[in-house]
Amino acid sequence: MTTPIVFCNPSNIEESLLYINKSLFSKGVIQAEKLRLSHDIRDNCNIVNIIYRLLRATDEERLEKESLLDAIKNNEYEKQRDNNTIKRLKNELELYQNECQLQLNKVRTLERDQAELITQNKGLKDVNAKNELTLKALKNQLSVSLRQHEQQMETLKGNYGLVKARKGRNLNSMLIVKEPIKQNTNAPILPETASFLQQNDENSNFLNSRVNNDEFQLLKGLNNELKKSNGTLLTCLSGTLNSLVEMLSPLYERPNSNPFEVCELNAILLDAKIQNQLLFIRNLLHERKYVSIDELDAILEENEKNKHLINILQKENKRVFEFLTNMHDKF
């Protein structure tokens, strides 16, 4: 506990009381009364009353400060809440702006699509109008042809009536039938009909050329695939034969080698050759490629050579085995 500061002592008691009275009077705590130190009970009560006033003023000031502090805290809380509300409103505004931008982009896309549809619709209307004109021209030609056909039928009926009437008078008369009116091959063709016929000819020529081109490209691709597969097969056979020759060359260059080494080498060569043949057949069956007759003859010839070499290896192994058997019997 700290020692309180002492302002008054017996040497300055009078000056201290005078200073206190002036200070209390200036602050409005006392009016006419003064602090006096005496044995009078009234002076002591006056001192106690002044102390009570000071305590109450201190309590009121403390309460006022506490209320001000609470008000400040409430203001800070309101300010923080307002800031949070502002942030939330900003986020909602950004989301709304983004949504508006998306809707605007959709509207622009729909407008472009609508413009394209309008253009396509206009083109379809033009095509439909041309088709209607062409159909109208064809109907006109059909009606003309029908009228000509009706005229021909009427002419034939008239000729038949004349012949039938004359038949009773002259049995030797010949049936005279007027030649039907031939359609004029040089008759003018309407512009709509001419353009329609020309368009049909162009479409048919285009389709025929397209079909022929597709068939040619298909055959060309098939031919390239056959060439590629045949080249792969010939390369495989050539590599197999070369590897077999390379493997057999040391065997015939050293005829006086150790029989055990010769037997081991022959076994390795024979196994490698058989594995190569199996791999070749497996690849051939897996790819399911087709070869020409000439290339098939070459493949068969290579297979015969491979069979001959395999027989040579088998005979060599048999000879080495017999040699080893004789050596074992001797020892």
Swiss-Prot record:
Name a Pfam family for this protein: ADIP
What keywords sit in the KW lines? Coiled coil, Cytoplasm, Meiosis
Coiled coil as a keyword of this entry, yes or no, is yes
Record GO terms (molecular function):
spindle pole body anchor activity
Q: Which gene encodes it?
A: mug172
Q: Which GO terms describe its biological process?
A: meiotic cell cycle; microtubule anchoring at mitotic spindle pole body; mitotic sister chromatid segregation
- Family note: Belongs to the ADIP family.
- Name of the molecule in the record: Meiotically up-regulated gene 172 protein
The UniProt entry lists the main location of this chain as cytoplasm
Q: What does this protein do?
A: Has a role in meiosis.
Q: Which InterPro entries match?
A: Afadin/alpha-actinin-bd
Q: What is the lineage of its organism?
A: Eukaryota, Fungi, Dikarya, Ascomycota, Taphrinomycotina
List locations, semicolon-separated. Answer: Cytoplasm
